[in-house]
């Protein structure tokens, strides 16, 4: 037990939070009995009308009616007061927005009245085949309490009636037909509850050399630890023994823990006579609706995912899809599709319908049609999700990673066209960037680690998620089956969130900017060289390796489709050529411009900031030089010089009582002359650079700077204490103008005096030559810094 406690104490610093939610649709749908309109249990005069067939080639938008009943008939009764009421309103708002999006995409026609389940209300039926009421209800179930759909009680007003039949003759009506729900094609029941599925997640550990009992004990302890903190463990966690010690160490740099695990789940409950879904229920996990970590957009996208399951994107419903060769408006020609899914020679389950296969081929840039779209490997032969390796970012993959990174993609909409129940407005599709134009080999386990596609990565470094909205870590998960990609982190690494920026006064040597129009770029920019670093230039780095760069957040601005420019803190806008590396004025290092990732959609291009975003007005620029004196005969190598420069910089920042955001590009010569450029970075809190410059001058004149480095003491020389260069452009221009005016006045005066002397005296000797005073400009070039 001590071992477990030690492990749990070591665990928190290594946690890498990943904001992801998984879908439980397959196991949920299996628990629900699908009802179709049965042979009527009522006389013909009392029967409800069946679904009206479309009479037009222009079907109307799908009419979805949501019904929030607030019942408590299932496990996990939920208190609707206080936080619960707020969670319920969030759920209903998400349902309204999600159904509005669907209504603009899918279209059918017809009224709606739901069926009752004879197995629920009827205890026995007539079994004599010769009886006129054969298989009709002969004995009612005394415990019948009505119909429900995934725990939501269906009102009698939404249901057909039922009757008790004698062996011969007319029935005794028990419950007449309800009025039904007018102008509705699909009924969605909404529940908010605490259920067992909301907490359903398991941990499996791989601990080589450990007994099964020890692994089970550790699993239970880790699960308990995670759940007490509101997290749920992902299914796989590997530990290994370190030498002969009994204390396990982590096999990788992090343990992935997610929270929340399940936002919502849904199922279809009833079908019409052509197997089209008529009703379903979505259950929201109450504890997550009040979580600040989930935005309204997140809940809407999670709702949309579950709603599409209930409308037919389900392994349980694929076999019921219809083939309508004459088009949607002639339903009498429709039949059940003979082949919707199949397994290939490697056992991969594929959805093989025509529109889906063509849509995938178009997405990958393959001519003709693909052999089908891979479905996620799940328990059994049924799967209700796209394979994550191939369609990462699609709304219908098995894990949800936030609204910002999820798309209602063309391939998913093509699936609904193939269902035969709906017509699809393809203009509502959102572009899926993952794998676009990558060819038929993309997304295979055998190719994802070969470096053939930059959508995947190798190793475990930090970089950028493929949408470039977030920084990410190169990692895998069970859905990727060994393939690795830059997965977003949840520790304030979203570049588009301004609140993730650096606090006031904190040094920002890489010049990062967090802003709604910021994106993640692979870069190694720095405003100051650390000991051992060397400035890199494109000419010296013809093949820039991914390992040399990290994900950094910088401002971007679209200038056209696929064209953009970038801005680093304190720099001007710089054109970013896709597929190239660029340098940024004022910074050492390089920035890589991704190709085919940014400014690809009309939405991106329309988001151009006009006028360009201005973060702050640049402060004046100064150059500060100090001549140091060291021990007699003491010499420094190159690395020692760089170390001393860094030590002097730290001492200066300490002396000025400010952060390093005022000091840039420190250097030192072999003759021990230290030089640093002074300018105030945007976001840097404190006095103006001119005030700091003056204060440092006065302070160092009173008390020389002392630095201890490499076993030796260095001090500034009193006689050569400070040499400054003012780089304020306006002041420089003013001084130049005044100097020129003074020179002209002197020249005019000299010429006038000479002329007067010539006229007043005889030219007995040449006039004395006049040497005008030389004007020394105070402008000193600042390498790597643009003068403004």
From Swiss-Prot:
Low complexity bias located where? 40-56
Annotated positions binding Zn(2+): 305, 309, 385
Q: Where in the cell is it found?
A: Membrane
Sugar attachment sites: 333, 425, 491, 524, 713
Query: What disease does the record describe for this protein?
Result: Heterotaxy, visceral, 12, autosomal: A form of visceral heterotaxy, a complex disorder due to disruption of the normal left-right asymmetry of the thoracoabdominal organs. Visceral heterotaxy or situs ambiguus results in randomization of the placement of visceral organs, including the heart, lungs, liver, spleen, and stomach. The organs are oriented randomly with respect to the left-right axis and with respect to one another. It can be associated with a variety of congenital defects including cardiac malformations. Early death may occur. HTX12 inheritance is autosomal recessive.
Which positions make up the signal peptide? 1-20
Which stretches of sequence are listed as region Disordered? 40-59, 767-788
From the Swiss-Prot or TrEMBL record, give the protein name. Answer: Ciliated left-right organizer metallopeptidase
Catalytic EC class = hydrolase
**GO CC, alphabetical:** cytoplasm; membrane
A GO molecular function annotation here is: metalloendopeptidase activity
The membrane topology noted for this protein in its Swiss-Prot or TrEMBL record is: Single-pass type I membrane protein
Family named by the database record:
Belongs to the peptidase M8 family.
Q: What is the effect of changing residue 389 to I?
A: In HTX12; uncertain significance
Q: Name one GO biological process term.
A: proteolysis
Write out the entry's keywords from A to Z: Disease variant, Glycoprotein, Heterotaxy, Hydrolase, Membrane, Metal-binding, Metalloprotease, Protease, Signal, Transmembrane, Transmembrane helix, Zinc
Q: Which residues lie on this side of the membrane: Extracellular?
A: 21-735
């Amino acid at each position: 037990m001590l071992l477990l406690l030690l492990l749990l104490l070591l665990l928190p610093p290594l946690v890498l939070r990943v904001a992801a939610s998984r879908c439980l649709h397959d196991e949920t749908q299996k628990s629900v009995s699908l009802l179709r309109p049965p042979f009527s249990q009522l006389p013909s005069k009392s029967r409800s009308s069946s679904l009206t067939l479309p009479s037009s080639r222009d079907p109307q938008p799908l009419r979805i009616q949501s019904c929030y009943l607030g019942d408590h008939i299932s496990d996990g009764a939920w208190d609707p007061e206080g936080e619960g009421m707020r969670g319920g309103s969030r759920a209903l708002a998400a349902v309204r927005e999600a159904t509005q999006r669907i209504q603009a995409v899918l279209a059918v026609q017809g009224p709606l009245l739901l069926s009752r389940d004879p197995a629920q209300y009827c205890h026995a039926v007539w079994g004599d085949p010769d009886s006129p009421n054969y298989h009709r209800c002969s004995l009612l179930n005394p415990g019948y309490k009505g119909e429900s759909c995934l725990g939501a009680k269906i009102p009698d007003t939404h249901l057909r009636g039922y009757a008790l039949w004698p062996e011969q003759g007319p029935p005794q009506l028990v419950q007449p037909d309800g009025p039904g729900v007018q102008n509705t094609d699909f009924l969605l029941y909404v529940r908010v509850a605490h259920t067992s599925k909301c907490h359903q997640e398991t941990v499996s550990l791989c601990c080589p050399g450990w007994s099964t009992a020890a692994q089970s004990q550790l699993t239970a302890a880790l699960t308990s630890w995670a759940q007490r903190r509101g997290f749920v463990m992902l299914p796989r966690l590997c530990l290994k023994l370190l030498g002969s010690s009994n204390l396990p160490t982590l096999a990788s740099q992090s343990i992935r823990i997610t929270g929340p695990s399940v936002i919502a789940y849904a199922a279809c409950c009833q079908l019409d006579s052509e197997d089209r879904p008529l009703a379903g229920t979505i259950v929201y996990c109450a504890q997550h609706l009040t979580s600040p970590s989930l935005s309204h957009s997140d809940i809407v996208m999670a709702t949309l995912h579950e709603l599409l399951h209930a409308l037919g994107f389900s392994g349980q419903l694929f076999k019921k899809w219809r083939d309508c060769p004459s088009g949607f408006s002639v339903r009498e020609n429709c039949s059940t599709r003979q082949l919707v899914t199949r397994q290939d020679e490697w056992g991969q389950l594929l959805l093989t319908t025509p529109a889906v296969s063509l849509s995938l081929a178009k997405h990958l840039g393959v001519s003709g049609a693909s052999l089908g779209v891979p479905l996620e490997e799940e328990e059994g032969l049924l799967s209700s999700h796209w394979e994550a390796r191939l369609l990462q970012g699609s709304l219908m993959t098995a894990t949800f990673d936030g609204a910002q990174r999820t798309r209602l993609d063309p391939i998913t909409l093509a699936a609904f066209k193939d269902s035969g129940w709906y017509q699809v407005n393809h203009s509502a599709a959102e572009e899926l960037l993952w794998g676009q134009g990558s060819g038929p080999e993309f997304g295979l386990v055998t190719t994802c680690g070969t470096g053939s596609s930059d959508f995947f990565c190798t190793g475990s470094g930090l970089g950028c998620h493929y949408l470039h909205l977030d920084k990410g870590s190169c990692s895998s998960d069970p859905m990727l089956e060994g393939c690795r990609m830059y997965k977003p982190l949840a520790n304030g690494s979203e570049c588009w969130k301004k609140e993730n920026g650096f606090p006031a006064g904190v040094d920002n040597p890489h010049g990062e900017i967090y802003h709604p129009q910021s994106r993640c770029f692979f870069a190694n920019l720095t405003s100051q060289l650390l000991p051992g670093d060397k400035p890199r230039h494109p000419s010296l780095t013809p093949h820039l390796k991914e390992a040399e760069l990290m994900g950094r957040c910088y401002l971007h601005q679209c200038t056209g489709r696929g064209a953009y420019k970038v801005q680093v803190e304190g720099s001007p806008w710089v054109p970013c050529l896709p597929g190239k590396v660029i340098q940024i004025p004022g910074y050492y290092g390089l920035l890589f411009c991704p190709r085919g990732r940014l400014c690809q959609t009309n939405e991106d291009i329309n988001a151009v900031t006009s006028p360009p975003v201005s973060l702050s007005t640049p402060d004046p620029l100064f150059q500060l030089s100090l001549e140091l004196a060291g021990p007699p005969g003491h010499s420094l190598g190159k690395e020692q010089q760089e170390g001393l420069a860094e030590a002097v910089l730290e001492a200066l920042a300490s002396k000025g009582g400010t952060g390093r955001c005022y000091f840039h590009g420190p250097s030192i010569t072999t003759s021990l002359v230290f030089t640093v450029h002074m300018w105030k970075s945007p976001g840097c809190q404190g006095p103006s650079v001119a005030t700091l410059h003056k204060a440092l001058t006065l302070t160092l004149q009173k008390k020389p700077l002392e630095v201890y480095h490499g076993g030796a003491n260095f001090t500034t020389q009193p006689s050569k204490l400070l040499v400054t260069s003012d780089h304020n452009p306006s002041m420089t221009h003013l001084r130049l103008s005044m100097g020129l005016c003074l020179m002209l006045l002197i020249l005019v005066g000299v010429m006038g005096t000479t002329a007067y002397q010539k006229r007043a005296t005889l030219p007995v000797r040449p006039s004395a030559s006049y040497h005008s005073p030389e004007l020394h400009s105070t402008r000193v070039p600042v390498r790597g810094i643009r003068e403004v």
